[in-house]
Amino acid sequence: MATNQFANRTRQTLAWITTCGERVRSWYEDYRFGSIDENAQLGRRGEQAAAQLLRRKGLNVIAESESDRAGEIDLIALRKRPRLIVFVEVKTLSTTRPGHPADRVDENKQARITRAALRYLKRKKLLGITCRFDVVAVWWPRDEPRPTRVEHYESAFNAVGVDSFYG
């Protein structure tokens, strides 16, 4: 009888420790990589999930939703060694329609991102630094607290209208 009570008490203690461990891990990940605002619109939540992924990969997210008259860049990240600026377009899909979120980054969108990136580099006096254009695809079904899938495509496209980088 005493061993049965001991076994039950041990199971309860382990369950409590596991629950506490999950809470601590969740808190630490939010602290370390950024949290997701569950009240934000879908696109914004997708950008937050993408920023978490980039931080996990060792990139430093230096700007979010950077925009000017040339267009908007969802995320701008920096890799320190070797020095590289990464311009990231995030596409979030909430439905079960066929198709890939990244397919929505067509040539017109690429051109707008390229122009906005050039203006950003000129404005910050960073024209000599290597840059890359990435796409992050996020699948986030309706009524789900977290995305079901997040994929990062490095060097997803080259600068469109490259001569404008030097004009």
UniProtKB/Swiss-Prot annotation:
It comes from the Bacteria. This is UPF0102 protein RB9115. It holds the Pfam family UPF0102. PANTHER family: UPF0102 PROTEIN YRAN. GO terms for molecular function: nucleic acid binding. It comes from Rhodopirellula baltica (strain DSM 10527 / NCIMB 13988 / SH1). Belongs to the UPF0102 family.
